[in-house]
Amino acid sequence: MKYDYLVVGSGLYGAIFAHEAKAKGKSVLVVDKRPNIAGNVYTEKQEGINVHMYGAHIFHTNDKRVWNYITQFAEFNRFTNSPVANYKGELYSMPFNMYTFNKMWGVVTPEEATTKIEEQKKEITGEPKNLEEQAISLVGRDIYEKLVKGYTEKQWGRDCKELPAFIIKRLPVRLTFDNNYFNALYQGIPIGGYTKMVENLLDGIEVRLNTDYLEHKAELDALADKVVYTGPIDAYFGFKLGTLEYRSVRFENETLDIPNFQGNAAVNYTDRETPWTRIIEHKWFEFGKDEDGNDLPKTIISREYSSEWKAGDEPYYPVNDEKNGQLYAKYKELADKETGVIFGGRLGEYKYYDMDTTIASVLNMCEKELS
């Protein structure tokens, strides 16, 4: 059988395109080299808990079109992201808000907090030369030392004085007691997990798992008129211009025979000495309950470690610096010349996408491609 579209990758971008193409009467084949669908939003049920296998995914958006679209495929709960920062046993509220400033300095009013921050920002004069100076110019020395420095150095594997200032364009400072990390109109987690949501998107569509497109490119290309490719753009071209860099993350998952490990979905460890950047306790994404509303007796945690990416590792975050940007531009030129191939998604476009921007991007592409 000849398909209208071969979709490479069953993450959000690939699954949504496949769904929309099928809805327009097109025949679609989806292939994925992993043994499961859903890409990095894949959740796996263990001990009654939906475990985010590739790191915490909290859906948030201000885009009503995106929200109305994705909620057709899952009911979302009311989870809001309120991480806690642990600095050597001192707990602080994230984002930086009045709870943070009260704990740090004993200030009680927004005016007192503003005065304290302004006082500390004065340390930096002129244009910040590196990330350390940039952070201090935004939030002052105390918050930088306890809540920014160690965490950032673990994430990037480099001293803050060696990192460019542009990495931290802004550090949201809130002069309220609002603990909601995202300023988003719509927020939540799909009830029953993301995998179920992607299953609904792919309903009635042929999916072949454990299928590496690049290893079987010629025979798979022959099956379809057009390809939608959501894998790494440099891999598609055999890395012939060089390798695009990513930051990677490693997870250590542990099942514990206790009902509650840390009392919150996410705790960031902001000192340099603790080797992990944060611990996720997955059950709190769904309020510690199973689908029938019963308390879950066990818990599952994931310790998250930032690591330098090397070929073969899972690519997570594109390193959008000048060098990689220029290399991507060259690959993009090659991609634009490929006939019958659409490159999309985080890896296909070498772009840091949140889930909502991925959805917006693929819906825009569908309008152009399928209308």
Please place each PLM-identified region on the residue numbering.
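N-terminal Rossmann-like FAD-binding beta1-loop-alpha1 element of flavoenzymes
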Residues: 3-30, 366
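Active-site/ligand-binding neighborhood in enzyme catalytic cores
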Residues: 85-92, 98-226, 230, 235-237
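Mid-domain catalytic core of redox enzymes
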Residues: 24, 214-334
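N-terminal FAD cofactor-binding segment of flavoenzymes
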Residues: 56-90
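Glycine-rich FAD pyrophosphate-binding loop
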Residues: 19-47
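C-terminal catalytic lobe of FAD-dependent flavoproteins
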Residues: 314-371
